[in-house]
């Protein structure tokens, strides 16, 4: 992770690992295969993910494009950060404030 005065750059693999850990705590298993994210759960219905654009085969198994996954998990941060991403990294740029004061 690279932290600058007003931006944070996170390698995509680290970003996904962190998000997958959070999702696991909610009882949902997430896995990246190619450019798709596969979600599954034995006890949590994934209806909320379907409302957010996931393609669900049933209530417990969904898949969605990586871009949609990133949009979903970063939507709360968008009021404070400009969120940019590509296949290698996710960049958060502070909106009007510095993330690190030196």
UniProtKB/Swiss-Prot annotation:
Transmembrane segments: none
Coiled-coil annotated spans: none
Domain of life: Viruses
Protein name stated in the entry: Uncharacterized protein ORF102
Origin species: Acidianus filamentous virus 1 (isolate United States/Yellowstone) (AFV-1)
């Amino acid at each position: 992770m690279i932290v600058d005065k007003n931006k944070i750059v996170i390698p995509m693999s680290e970003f996904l690992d962190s998000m997958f850990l959070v999702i696991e705590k909610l009882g949902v298993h997430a896995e990246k295969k190619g450019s798709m994210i596969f979600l599954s759960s034995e006890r949590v219905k994934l209806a909320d993910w379907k409302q957010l654009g996931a393609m669900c085969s049933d209530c417990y198994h969904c898949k969605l494009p990586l871009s949609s996954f990133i949009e979903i998990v970063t939507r709360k941060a968008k009021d404070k950060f400009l969120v940019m991403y590509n296949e290698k990294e996710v960049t958060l740029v502070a909106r009007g404030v510095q993330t690190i004061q030196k």
